[in-house]
Amino acid sequence: MIVAERGIHTVELYWQGLSFASLQMIVDDLYDQKQIYLRKKNHLNTSRVYDTANVFPDGIIMRIEQRYPEPGGIRFIINPYTLSSGKYVPEELYYPTMDPSIMEHVLNVIKNTFNDREWKIDPQKLTLSRVDLTWNFYLSNEIDLTEIIRLFKHGQRKKTTKLDTFQDKSKDQHSFRMRFSDTTLTVYDKEFQVTQKGLRVGDNANILRVELSMQRRAYMRSLELKDRTDISMDEVLYRLYQKNYDLIHHYIDFLCPCTGKHLPYQKAVKEIENQVNQPDIREKMLYFLEKYSLQGTTQGNGLTGGLPPVRFSM
């Protein structure tokens, strides 16, 4: 039996259009207080990214994105579960019922944190720029997550969809990411990801995580809000949580429309040879299985071209 839970993993707030000089004032002040460090920069030093340290409670990260000559911005990355519970648990997700006013709390924390500084952060300037809707699938330890991830990766997709790879065989086996116009779908082995960071999930759980990261334009369209500004961030999170199932299920159904038992190629061949008694049907099934397998490995397009979708019933 598959146990699944759905919730929200990460949200982001963003203040855009800030000049290089105005951001430098903030950076200098935080450096004096030893509350900031340089995360990365380009070779010309015209683009820098800073993260704060020991400024906010666990669950809030402030990231300054400084660019020249283009304007930069300030990004707040929030883990609602960590913030509301006071502790970081890798596999846990946030549900709006845990703290219905979590975003109002975040805005107050941001405003009050810098009350004594010469510069201010106006919460009214912050927009809800990203929401990560998430599913955790708790599977039995006998299930090979890399095989499920492979099926997702080679599922049908549009030509305009970009498939990200990590250029690392192990990471590519345990995760993949697809980028659409204003959404990103990430599927990965949660235990593998956490282990890479030197942590562990509880009870050696075999967790397949599916994340749908929605930019502002995407979630506004999904909720049919157009350009409304009279709705609170907490209300947006609640409505997205209510639609979590439909939104993620749409992408899962599109990538993997088939149902039933999924097997590696060699095991599938043996199943067909042992269980399909009619020679002509067995021959056709083995033929299509071989064609699909070759298509997914030699062409790199999964099931997107050449052959139409086929389903077998055994």
What do the predicted segments below correspond to?
Residues 1-296:
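Structured, helix-rich domain cores that form ligand/interaction pockets
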Residues 298-304, 309-314:
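Helix-turn-helix DNA-binding helix
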